[in-house]
Amino acid sequence: MSDTPQQDTATPAWGTRRGPTVPYIPGLDGLRAIAVLSVIVYHADPRWLGGGFLGVEVFFVISGYLITLLLVAERERTGTVTLSHFWVRRARRLLPALWTLLTGVGLWCVLFDRDRLGMLRGDAIAGFLYVSNWFQVWTGSSYTSSFAFAPLRHLWSLAVEEQYYIIWPVVMFVLLRRLRRSTLPLLAVWFTALAVVVAGLTAWMYHPGVIGTFAETPDQYMTLFGRHVLRTDFLYLGTLSRSSGLLLGAALAMVWRPWALVRRGMQRATVLFDALGTAAIAALGWTFWVFRDVVRGETEHAYDLLYRGGFLIVGVASVIAIMAVTKPRSVLGRYVVGNPLFVWIGTRSYGLYLYHWAVFQAHRKTAGTPLTVKEFVGLMIITLALTELSYRFIEYPVRMGVLGRAWSRWRDPRSLQDIAFRRRVSVASVVVILLPVVVAVSMAGAQVKPDDITANLDNNEDAVVTIPTIGPRPTTAPGEKWHHRGVAFTP
């Protein structure tokens, strides 16, 4: 990121700004690294970092900020927002690794675990269509169930983001077309207010208490298109209820654009912002630790804090951290959070998030089984290898337009080398096409073979969870079992 981007003293018209669309900001990759590592550690064993699931909220804020920043930058530079170009860029960025994951998980089950192939069908279709969050809400199937085989259910957060990527550019296209550039700060106020409203609605809809069947605890359910679904499922997985972080990031993009941070007063405040950013990152670490009570259920108000302001606290801390690391000449952003290791992890955070959960599941078979340190290290080596291979040979080449160039060379060979290249590409294309087809056909014909525990959970047997209330905590009878059936605690 340049230390001295240009800023006009007056407010220029749309389409008059020169320069790069959005400069590269290593500090943001550093924040991504912190977020994805917290999630991975939590997934390995919640006892290690019980609030690590909140790293997903950090991702939401970063995504809201960057996507809105890209849209505003395009409007400032060209005078318009080309939606088709935006969506093509997002598809190049997200789809290759996702399709690789879906094919790989399906192929693993075809070869080594056919009995579970049928159980993947719904998750695979939902993941492919980016509706995993609503699929889990609708079916009541979350991967927090300690006994679930769910190698694809972590895709719910990507579904939330992709739905945002579809809707938000249209919203911004309309707003930026109708409003003047000078009204961007007002939009920031509106978006912040909407984020607070979403947090307020989440707090209002949340009900503490015991969760059982609908007949036993009807207050813990809500009606969605005629179907009774858990409130905690809806609030944790729902696109609207999880939009507060995305909105906070969007609000920040209205007033905190890297190319507009050249004023001398802002430069002199570098030390102050570094201090605030350090405090914000420390606050995130504190939430990652203190929210372990949400998983353990050791305090009376743990769940209340999560749904009654917890997500908003994480969102605000994330906003402050983003402000600090994106500020020109930020020591925190360039050298601390933006150190080479964190940048390397951050640039591959998408692949790390995609592959780590599937690798963990392939080893332990069930979601709730904690990993030992030795298992964790071994599985992370595999995850890092898969992530790097995916990044170097699938994700990055597609983003850089390699497929388009290969297609042009294949369609119009002009030398013997091009002809040989055409043959190699043809063979590779057949393999790439056949693998997902084989997986899809096998999955379509597979029978669902749930184990006894899954069948019991589907019948709402032995599927009660205690959510602490403001008053005394409910207690269980001697020998009674409690299972986390909702998704309130897992990203």
What do these predicted ranges mean?
Residues 1-7, 491:
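N-terminal acidic, proline/glycine-rich, low-complexity intrinsically disordered segments
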Residues 5-7, 12-18, 23-28, 34-450:
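Hydrophobic membrane-embedded alpha-helices
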Residues 433-490:
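Membrane-interface segments at or immediately adjacent to transmembrane helices
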